Amino acid sequence: MKQTAPALVSTEINEYILDNGLTVWLNEDHSQPKVFGAVVVMAGSKDSPNTGIAHYFEHMMFKGTEQIGTTDYAAEKVLLDAIEAKYEELAATKNSKRREAIQMEINELSIRAADFVIPNEFDRLITKYGGSKLNAGTSYDYTVYHNLFSPQYLEQWAELNSERLIRPVFRMFQSELETVYEEKNRRDDMILNRSIERLMEKYFHPHPYAYPIIGSAENLKNPRLSEMKRFFRTYYVSSNMGLILSGDFDTRRALPIIERTFSRIPRGVPDAAPTVRIRPFRGRERTTIKIPLPLLKAVALGFRGVPANHPDQPALDVAAGILNNSNGTGYLDRLMVERRLMGAMIGGESFNEAGFIGIVAVPRLSHTCRSAERMIWRELERVKQGDFTDEIFNSLKREQLRRHLTELEDIDSRSQIMVRLFSQGKTWADYREELARAEALTKEDVVRVANKYFGANYLFVKKKTGRYPKERLKKPGFAPIVPKHADATSAYSDWLDRMPVEEVRPRFVDFTHDVQTLRPADGLTLYITPNRVNNIFTLKLSYAIGLIEEPRLKLLTGYIPLLGTASLTFDALHTRLQTLGSTLDLTADEYSLTLKITGFDTAFDETLELVSGFVSGVKADDAKLKTLVDDARVANKAFFKSNNEVAEALFEFVQYGPESQFLTRPSLRDVKRIKGRELVELFRHAVRRECTAHYCGTLPAERVVDRTLRCFSPGPDGRIAAVAPYRRLVSYDRPRVYLYHMPDVFQNIIYVYMPCQPLPTLHERHTADLFSLYFGEGMSSLMFQEIREFRSLAYYTSGAYRLPPYRLSDLPTRFVAYLSTQSDKTIDALEVLDALINHMPEHPERIDSLIRTEINRVNNAYPAFRDISTRIAEFRRDGYTDDPHRALLDDIRRMTMDDITRFYQAHVCGRKPVYVIVGNAHRIDRRRLATFGEIVRIHHQEFYR
């Protein structure tokens, strides 16, 4: 094994190359009891343009191998070969009737082949050996397979993931292809998806980046297994792969395991792809894109950017920061703050072979696109001429440094950087050099790249209202492909079972020792967590007032950040914060309003003084309210173009009736009438509420307490006690189906709501967790297998029992479920889901896997150091005095299938659910739909204000 020199950026990354050429990156981090494991393959959609092969292959990599997922591969292979031949015939056939006949033959062969399939065995084995969050993703340039796992199962993880890459088998092909259709339908219903696809096509043609990752509908209809196998043989070779581990493992122990398992992957070098040159724009090239949003106008300027490894990237990042930054002091930010534009932002992406830079401008409703473009060019010219101060330039470099340091400080974010770097063909040493180049940047570098890339050759894009046609995929008449051995185990599984495993108990949050908890004043709880990684602090002040109690907070969080004080304008305040390397954010959720301050501990005192002055002296400006009005107008128009948002609102109404947040929220009329002083008074009231503060940094507790008390005092009257509202669930006396018609969408979204009785004991609550896993959470759940895996009736499914906080355990509970399906499959999906709810099948063989899944979820979700105090505060707010996962795991280890069955019979079986359906109602058989309950056609004014 050849070893490269180790690198060190905040945390040590060791790079190795195995004898077969596979690259390994190892990062030991013992701060959390988990390991992130990933395999990155340098092959993406650009290597199979417009076919969707790279993406569909990613799906098939979950179906097992010659040893995993089968009871008899030799017998199964005979049928799989016949299926492959039929797909070749299908791709060569144009006659529609003959194509239907071939597909039915494939269906019959698939049903026979399923007699040998053990569905989801790979997922079950990953779970059995400490895994959670199993997933994958396909990009233009690469594909990544990843999950978290408990450290004691490193050997099993390596065995499974290397086996997966050596001998994959493309079983259950037909049903998974239908699932990919569902995924495509789901994407096509997203309001901007088709528009972005058209823009990518215009921008990148003739490069493969011009085509969608998922592929065209035409190519998806004509899949060739032979092409997929060729793709695998070409790109899934050792020199084209990287193994990434970050977390709680011992490198010396891990290396021999990795060498033994991953060195088995065949050697090889992928074929060099032909270089496709993207021509430069010639002058101001024009195009339009359709977006189904009336009222809103928009323009965009698209410039040629740089590929991922280009040395100009750091300077371009600073140039972009001069236009947009986290403090809202960029030149484009100011156009919005001053209400000259409704929206303006710069963004971009650097792929491996090309990049793009886009600047989007949204004029005010009464202004023109031409005026918006002129404003954008004026600000670009300022950057090109060097019209920015050294202070701003240095502050943006400091902002980049802060971002890099925080990205490296925990396993989750650091591992994503490792994946990105490897996928771009970089080493960790390259990353260090990038940081050094960024630190060494000069103002002249930024001016040079601004003039180089923001020139007269660009793509001018104008939005027009409209939709692109979508190709409806007809529901196939296939019979379900239901394997007979759903709970069997393979010989390979038995072999893994014989490996010795060290017993390691999960790690729980310790309320006493993990953080310091102080109560320095009435109504103030201060959590202090030491930061031993860098010198960046966060101070979060969470006030006990949320959107449920005070819906106007939604407006407040959009308005207050636009203001200044009597002595400091918005621009002066945020420029000073920017110079210090600090940021200020204001957010609201159901139960709290949170002020989050971030910066370097060296600037802690000055940052808090600035924020304190703002909080106590914020000054109303009614002119800024017009921004809220414009935003509300556009949001109202956009809302009913998104089936996901409409379904969420209708489901809220079904659960909470008049207390739905979509009915209590301020209406457009309310927004027009509200005064600035009203929101400022509300803000001043909110920051006097009981406060839970979270400091994470390097400063001593005494100093943090002193500055917090001095800067954020509630005044002589003290803090106002929390109200802690909780909404009551709506009950129904008979089954109903709430139906909302959206004719332009492909996918119908289905929600299920079933109000249930309270669960006052911990044992009942724990059983509800296990029931949820069994019924509707994860790839091995009943819903996933019966609805998606066997029948291809949905891309995404979920079902779970939802509980109020433990302190309110005497309140009612509810069962909820969700799926989205092609509109003409709605009744089929409902029938399967309804059957599961009313006649839940029992699989006692799954109980051990369920318990293991729960243990893994607890262990692998132990928080990063910056999030520990927030987790403890949430537990305490819910009524716990210790980490509740400790009691949960002790309890479920003793549970059996009988516990799940008793829970189901007592709390779910026999209850009539309420269904919510949002989508194309014209493609639903109303007579069959009525068998699920009284059909209620509902108008949007009933559930959306």
Language model features with spans:
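Proteolytic maturation boundary segments
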Residues: M1-T23, D250-P292, A298, D333, ...
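A common structural junction motif
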Residues: E163-R171, T261-V269, W377-F388, S612-D622, ...
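M16 family metallopeptidases and their MPP-like homologs
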Residues: N27, Q32-D47, I53-Y56, T70-E163, ...
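Carboxylate/His-rich catalytic cores and anion/metal-binding grooves
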Residues: Y181-D188
